């Protein structure tokens, strides 16, 4: 049995100490890291509860419940940040990526503790694939919110649309992972390739300007 709340405390403790030492300018980064790990912890409990209530099998829990719960939970601290602090557009995407990255980090650590770390090649691909998938979802949501929240009429519809896009991408990834075999490694490679293609496109556009 994996006591993920104990893992959470161990990972968050040094972040809290670092946040106190680094000063106010860096405080936002550490708070978003802690928020990302916190919503990952809560997502695990909610996923388990909903799977039990709905009597879902492993495939249904992985492909139908987990993507919806996890993407909604990752959105909550971001929406709180937007509503309370009303940040400028250029601060929204880094916040979303930080939450997504810390979510993926905590998820990977829990996976390693539960399943072992003896298969290096599998762990290597899973680490990059899962991390890139969560970061890609963070890029979609964060980049989109930076645009939609500057326009009042787009806030609600835009947020729902971006959440739906992130859930769909997450569900496709989880479905390929659950299928196994070659599809599993395609799933690991796909987010990495999409992130790389996006960065390359952004670099080319910046050079043209």
Labelled PLM ranges:
Residues 1-209:
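Hydrophobic alpha-helical segments at protein termini of multi-pass membrane proteins
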């Amino acid at each position: 049995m994996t006591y993920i709340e104990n893992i959470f405390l161990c990972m968050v403790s040094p972040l809290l100490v670092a946040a106190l030492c680094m000063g106010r300018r860096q405080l936002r980064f550490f708070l978003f890291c802690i928020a990302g790990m916190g919503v990952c912890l809560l997502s695990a409990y909610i996923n388990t509860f909903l799977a039990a209530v709905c009597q879902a099998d492993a495939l249904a829990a992985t492909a139908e419940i987990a993507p919806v719960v996890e993407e909604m939970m990752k959105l909550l601290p971001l929406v709180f940040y937007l509503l309370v602090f009303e940040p400028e557009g250029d601060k929204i995407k880094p916040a979303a990526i930080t939450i997504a990255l810390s979510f993926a980090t905590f998820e990977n650590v829990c996976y390693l503790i539960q399943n072992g770390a003896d298969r290096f090649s599998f762990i290597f691909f899973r680490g990059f694939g899962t991390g890139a998938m969560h970061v890609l979802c963070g890029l979609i949501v964060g980049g989109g919110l930076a645009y939609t929240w500057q326009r009042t009429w787009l806030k609600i519809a835009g947020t729902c649309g971006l959440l739906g896009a992130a859930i769909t991408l997450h569900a496709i990834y989880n479905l390929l992972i659950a299928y196994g075999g070659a599809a599993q490694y395609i799933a690991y490679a796909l987010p990495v390739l999409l992130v790389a293609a996006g960065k390359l496109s952004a670099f080319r556009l910046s050079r043209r300007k």
